Structures are given as structure tokens and as C-alpha cells.
């Protein structure tokens, strides 16, 4: 597979500055073209060994990996009060650059920095950056990322315990260019008290029998509405479950193909909105968060692994931990959630660690990857402490078969369900345009759901949006 060109790397992020566009077309100086000659990863592999740098620059979009690093990387010595830096035992200073994900902000700033990587001072070069599943291929299929085996030095044996899909999604032509501490299968998290009221049971096995396909799921939505509840919070909640079960990638060549399964999401969401089965919220807005808390009347939420411990738990509390609240039964609806498989297997998100071409900290990067993504004991401890689902099959199977219980989930061992779901994840239809096209598709149809435009107008708005964002994509094909 031919790697993404410098110009298409920029186009895939949806933004091309005038200067960058000129450089991409050959109008820039040689110092500004990070990938103008041989692939950076190849250069890194053939370069003589150099002394390790004393500054490790890590770029990410929130503090999740920062927390994992500071709490579980054995070489951490001290953490600055403002958490802007972490000092390692060998004296290396880890500098954290955190740019929020909203409106492509993280990718835009990361892209600019990577394009200037060659000309940056050694202590300013990016060493590690984090990527998500939705846009992983944009980066790993470029010359800005190091091969974790050939360039960084991990071995097949080091990586053997990880879920295969977590390696496949960051691999191009056999070259693995990232690694992760987490696997992210999805489940359906529901309110126990609401399930009891609507279905007469809160038992996960029994609840699953009512939600095992979309027809049954829709039947429960009607029953929930009759009891005064919403089945889902908003427009976006079920989207991943549909988009992860498409029959082909979004883009082939320069043609965008809208999968039939996405139109099933449109039909269901329109029906739920018209019938009052949702609260018309959008993912991450205040209504959506509130619906997960003590005053919420929503039956459930589609969440993957990180969502349980990183988002849902926090939203369930009446008194946030930042205000002195404790993660315990009695604080809000802590303990009132449970999880089941839901109507279809899916995944949501996941964060991969990438080594940046041009880094002078390859040994440190290797050690970070080894300890935080390959060490079975550390992976198991992260799960035991945080309820996150980590990327080690043996460790997760041990917990799944143990007497482990989540107090937040009313004593349920949710790791057992995640372990079963993780083996069903299929990343074969992932592509570099996924994030932008998924967001544009969801945004275009919100006006249709609320009755502001007809369906044909929503389709036209989607086509306009993606042609503005990705001018190299020339055609859009809709299901017959």
C-alpha cells in the first residue's frame, strides 16, 4: 500500500493552510517538508545510535493517558503540581501537551507540529503522540510514525498477549506503527431500577434477552416510553453500534459510499425522536451528561470500556469527586447501572501510543510501550484499580473468570462480558476518513431528526459538507 502523501495527510485532517498546500505542491523549502525524501521511519532505522534526549514530549487530547502514565509507569519519580511535567528516575523531563479534540483541534495542531518536526530543536520535537481509532490510519499510513518493531525495538513476543485487532488497526503492509494499553469492545449500560420497572428484572442475562436484536430493542423502547422513560438520551447514542457493522469502508478511491446500515440508524433515530423515545441530546452535551445522573430517566447508554469508568461513573454521582464526593453507593446512582451485550457487537474508540519519526528518545519510548502496553501485571492492575479494560488477553481472562465485582455496576463482573465482546471486534472496514465522515453524517441528519429539513436536504447537506472538508472525494453513493 502506498503511504499517504504529504498533501493527502493534510487533506485527511480537513484543513490545509496556504503555506502547507504550497509546501505539499513543492513550493516550500526543504526544511519544511518532513517527508520530502526517504520515509522518516526508514531513516530512523538506519541512523547510528545517539544519546537519549532528556526531554520526552508527549501529545494527547485529554488526561487519560497522562493519568495512566503517572500512576503506572514504574520509572516515574515526581509529578509537577500542575501536572504539566513528569520527571523520570533517570532525570528525563516528560512534557505534556494536551489539546482538546473539539472541532479537530487536536489533529490540526498535531499535524502542524509534525510537519515542522525536522526543523524543530531536539527538545521541542514530538516523541510520543496519541491517536484514536477513527483517524488512526491517517497517521500510521504516513511517514511521521515509527514502526514499533523495526524502529523502536519491540518484538513479536512482547506484543503476543495483545488483542489482534488492536495491532491490525495500526498496521500497514505488515508494519505495526502503534500500540495500546486498552481494548474497547462496547456494551449496553442500563439503569437497574428502570429495567426493573419496565421489564420486571434487572438481571443482565435476563435483560439481554429483551435487547438481543433491534426489533426487541425497539419493543423495549415503546414499553419504557409508556412508563415515562426515554430509551436513549439523544441522536448519537446508537450510532456506533450501526456504523461498526457496515459492509464496506466509507471511501473507495475517491468515492464515498453510505452504507445501508447507516440509513437504518437514520430511520431508527428519526422514529425515536418523533415518538419521544429520546431526549434530543447530542453526544457530550449537558443534557446527555445529566441523563446519566441521579435526575435522569433514560433506560441506557451504549458505552465501550473506557466510557464505564471514565465517563458514566463520574456522571452518575450526585457529588463529584472534585467536590469531595466518594465513588460509593449512596452518592447519586452509583451502583444502579449494569451492562449487557445489546443488539449488536461494536467497539468505540481506543487510544494508541505512537512513536514520532525524528525522536531522540527511542529507548525511552520502547520502555514506555513495553511497560504500559505489554506488561501483563501492569495491565491487570490497571483494570483492577480503574475498571478499564486493558489490552492483555490472559490478564482479562483471569479477571473474567475470577470473583471480581464492580460496585459501580451493582456487583457485576463486567470484564467477563467485555472479554467475550472483544473477540468479535472487526476493524476491516476502518479508514483514514472515518472521524470526519462520521461526524459530518451525524451533524447533517440532526436537522432532519428535529424536523427542520427533509431527508433529501439532509443528504445534500452531507454531500456539501464532505466536499468542503475533503475536496479530493468526488462522489457520494447512497443505498438504493
Label each region the model flagged.
Residues 83-102, 121, 202-207, 270-284, ...:
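A local structural motif
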Residues 151-158, 168-238, 250-283, 357-363, ...:
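Helix-loop-helix "hinge/cap" segment bordering the ligand-binding cleft or interdomain interface
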Residues 331-335, 383-443, 447, 475-480:
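Long, aromatic- and glycine/proline-rich binding clefts that accommodate carbohydrate-like moieties
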Residues 68, 192, 370-398:
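Periplasmic-binding protein-like
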Residues 40-47, 118, 131-187, 324-339:
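Hinge/lid segment of periplasmic solute-binding proteins
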Residues 99-112, 212-216, 280-292:
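Short helix-initiation/N-cap motifs at beta->coil->alpha
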Residues 3-5, 10-137, 156, 380, ...:
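Conserved N-terminal structural module of periplasmic/extracytoplasmic solute-binding proteins
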Residues 70, 74-75, 264-367:
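Extracytoplasmic/periplasmic substrate-binding proteins
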Amino acid at each position: 500500500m502506498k503511504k499517504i502523501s504529504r498533501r493527502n495527510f493534510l487533506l485527511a485532517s480537513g484543513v490545509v493552510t496556504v503555506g502547507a498546500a504550497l509546501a505539499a505542491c513543492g513550493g516550500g523549502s526543504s526544511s519544511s517538508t518532513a517527508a520530502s525524501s526517504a520515509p522518516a521511519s526508514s531513516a530512523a532505522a538506519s541512523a547510528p545510535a545517539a544519546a537519549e534526549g532528556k526531554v520526552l514530549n508527549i501529545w494527547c487530547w485529554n488526561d487519560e493517558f497522562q493519568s495512566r502514565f503517572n500512576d503506572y509507569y514504574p520509572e516515574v519519580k515526581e509529578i509537577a503540581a500542575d501536572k504539566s511535567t513528569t520527571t523520570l528516575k533517570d532525570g528525563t523531563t516528560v512534557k505534556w501537551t494536551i489539546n482538546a479534540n473539539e472541532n479537530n483541534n487536536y489533529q490540526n495542531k498535531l499535524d502542524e507540529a509534525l510537519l515542522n518536526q525536522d526543523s524543530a530543536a531536539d527538545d521541542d520535537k514530538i516523541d510520543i503522540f496519541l491517536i484514536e481509532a477513527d483517524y488512526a490510519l491517517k497517521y500510521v499510513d504516513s511517514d511521521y510514525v515509527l514502526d514499533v518493531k523495526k524502529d523502536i525495538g519491540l518484538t513479536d513476543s512482547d506484543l503476543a498477549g495483545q488483542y489482534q485487532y488492536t495491532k491490525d488497526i495500526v498496521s500497514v503492509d505488515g508494519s505495526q506503527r502503534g500500540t495500546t494499553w486498552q481494548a474497547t469492545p462496547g456494551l449496553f449500560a442500563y439503569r437497574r431500577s428502570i429495567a426493573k420497572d419496565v421489564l420486571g428484572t434487572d438481571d443482565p442475562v435476563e435483560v439481554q434477552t429483551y435487547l438481543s436484536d433491534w426489533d426487541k430493542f425497539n419493543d423495549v423502547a415503546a414499553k419504557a416510553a409508556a412508563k415515562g422513560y426515554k430509551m436513549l438520551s439523544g441522536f448519537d447514542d446508537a450510532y456506533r453500534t450501526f456504523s461498526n457493522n457496515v459492509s464496506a469502508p466509507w471511501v473507495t478511491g475517491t468515492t464515498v459510499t453510505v452504507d445501508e446500515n447507516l440509513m437504518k440508524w437514520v430511520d431508527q433515530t428519526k422514529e425515536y425522536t418523533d415518538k419521544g423515545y429520546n431526549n434530543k441530546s447530542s453526544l457530550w452535551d449537558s443534557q446527555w451528561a445529566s441523563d446519566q445522573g441521579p435526575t435522569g430517566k433514560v433506560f441506557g447508554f451504549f458505552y465501550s470500556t473506557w466510557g464505564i469508568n471514565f465517563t458514566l461513573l463520574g456522571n452518575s454521582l450526585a457529588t463529584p469527586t472534585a467536590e469531595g464526593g466518594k465513588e460509593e453507593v449512596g452518592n447519586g446512582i452509583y451502583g444502579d447501572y449494569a451492562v449487557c451485550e445489546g443488539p449488536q457487537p461494536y467497539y468505540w474508540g481506543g487510544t494508541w501510543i505512537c512513536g514520532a519519526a525524528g525522536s531522540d528518545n527511542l529507548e525511552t519510548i520502547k520502555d514506555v510501550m513495553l511497560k504500559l502496553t505489554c506488561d501483563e501485571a501492569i495491565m491487570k492492575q490497571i483494570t483492577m484499580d480503574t475498571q478499564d479494560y486493558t489490552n492483555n488477553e490472559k490478564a482479562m481472562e483471569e479477571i473474567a473468570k475470577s470473583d471480581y465485582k464492580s460496585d459501580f455496576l451493582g456487583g457485576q463482573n463486567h470484564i467477563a462480558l467485555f472479554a467475550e465482546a472483544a473477540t468479535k471486534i472487526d476493524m476491516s472496514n476502518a479508514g483514514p476518513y472515518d472521524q470526519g465522515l462520521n461526524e459530518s453524517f451525524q451533524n447533517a441528519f440532526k436537522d432532519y431528526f428535529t424536523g427542520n429539513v427533509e431527508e433529501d436536504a439532509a443528504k445534500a447537506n452531507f454531500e456539501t459538507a464532505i466536499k468542503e472538508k475533503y475536496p479530493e472525494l468526488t462522489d457520494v453513493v447512497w443505498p438504493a
